[in-house]
């Protein structure tokens, strides 16, 4: 595992050195270049801005539903599991703002720090936080660092929540865990907890190498603007151009399940008929059921009408 991390870091350093804005925020041109499939609205810096309405509907999506859509589209490595959590009974949804940290190296750290301070910035751990927008999720690769790793405690956590209204996905250790738990709405996924903090005196162990660059979270490559879906102890990162498809597919699955369960309770169909590919007669019955109940179902009426328009039976 350590060898794999080392190789990944070497490749990432080589990649970042050849990108504009190395060490800090990705350029707008590079962000546009790396997200060509997104044709919708963007933030001023070029980051894809998936609509709030899609984010609202995403809160009902399960990992299974998202995984199936992404796998069918060729995105097989978008799911990361086995996290420590804060407010584990809630769902985290938002647009990814990414930060990449690497093990500290004085010459590179000092060059980055000098440039940042010339722009009026302070500690590197606050630079990504300053860029957060409402409904963002701060997604940080802290390379799993535990002892001496935390760049987020209750002060930074409160700043993150004040700007985004969301929590974090943080591949590393956090500190001040009780203070973070006290932030209502700070739904978060992180690797571990430790009472220490990063870059203690005489121990430059971490540095910020990129903001909104492609970053690695476990086995996932995460891009700025991805939709973050965190629930049930795991996180799925959904490319922005697939977010609406994930939501619509999830809604159709839920409606079909509701219809199937209803008809089974009524004794209209057998389990064998519902558990296999539906016959044209059942599909027609489903469409009629949608039309009859569209004002009562837990899916927006407008979405049900759109589903009905697209059906051919």
Annotate each predicted stretch with a short phrase:
Residues 8-18:
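Bacterial N-terminal signal peptides
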Residues 21-23:
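Boundary at the C-terminal end of the N-terminal hydrophobic targeting segment
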Residues 46, 272, 286:
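Basic, amphipathic alpha-helical segments enriched in Lys/Arg and hydrophobic/aromatic residues
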Residues 1-5:
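Positively charged n-region of N-terminal signal peptides that target proteins for export
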Residues 26, 31-59, 66:
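Amphipathic alpha-helical packing elements
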Residues 57-65, 69-224, 237-283, 291-313:
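Feature captures the catalytic cores and cofactor-binding loops of soluble hydro-lyases/lyases
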Residues 46, 160, 226-228:
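Buried hydrophobic positions in well-ordered alpha/beta secondary-structure cores of metabolic enzymes
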Residues 231-232:
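Short acidic-glycine loop/turn motifs at beta-strand connectors
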């Amino acid at each position: 595992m350590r060898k794999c991390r080392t190789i990944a870091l070497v490749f990432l350093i080589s990649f970042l050195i050849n990108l504009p804005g190395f060490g800090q925020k990705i350029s707008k041109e590079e962000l546009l270049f790396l997200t060509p499939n997104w044709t919708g609205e963007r933030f001023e810096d070029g980051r894809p801005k998936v609509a709030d309405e899609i984010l609202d509907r995403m809160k009902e999506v399960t990992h299974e539903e998202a995984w199936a859509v992404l796998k069918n589209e060729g995105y097989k490595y978008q799911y990361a599991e086995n996290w420590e959590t804060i407010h584990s009974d809630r769902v985290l949804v938002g647009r990814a703002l990414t930060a990449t940290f690497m093990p500290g190296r004085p010459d590179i750290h000092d060059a980055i720090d000098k440039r940042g301070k010339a722009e009026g910035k302070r500690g590197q751990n606050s630079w990504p936080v300053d860029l957060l927008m409402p409904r963002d999720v701060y997604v940080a690769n802290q390379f799993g660092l535990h002892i001496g790793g935390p760049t987020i405690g209750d002060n930074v956590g409160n700043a993150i929540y004040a700007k985004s209204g969301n929590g974090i996905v943080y591949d590393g250790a956090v500190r001040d865990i009780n203070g973070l738990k006290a932030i209502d709405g700070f739904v978060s996924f992180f690797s571990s907890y430790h009472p220490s903090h990063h870059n203690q005196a005489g121990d430059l162990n971490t540095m910020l190498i990129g903001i909104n660059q492609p970053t690695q979270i476990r086995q996932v490559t995460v891009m700025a603007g991805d939709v973050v879906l965190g629930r049930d102890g795991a996180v799925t990162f959904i490319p922005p151009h697939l977010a609406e498809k994930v939501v619509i597919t999830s809604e159709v699955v839920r409606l079909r399940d509701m219809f199937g369960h209803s008809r089974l309770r009524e004794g209209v169909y057998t389990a064998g008929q519902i558990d296999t590919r539906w016959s044209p007669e059942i599909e027609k019955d489903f469409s009629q059921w949608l039309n009859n109940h569209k004002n009562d179902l837990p899916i927006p009426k407008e979405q049900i009408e759109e589903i009905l328009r697209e059906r051919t039976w």
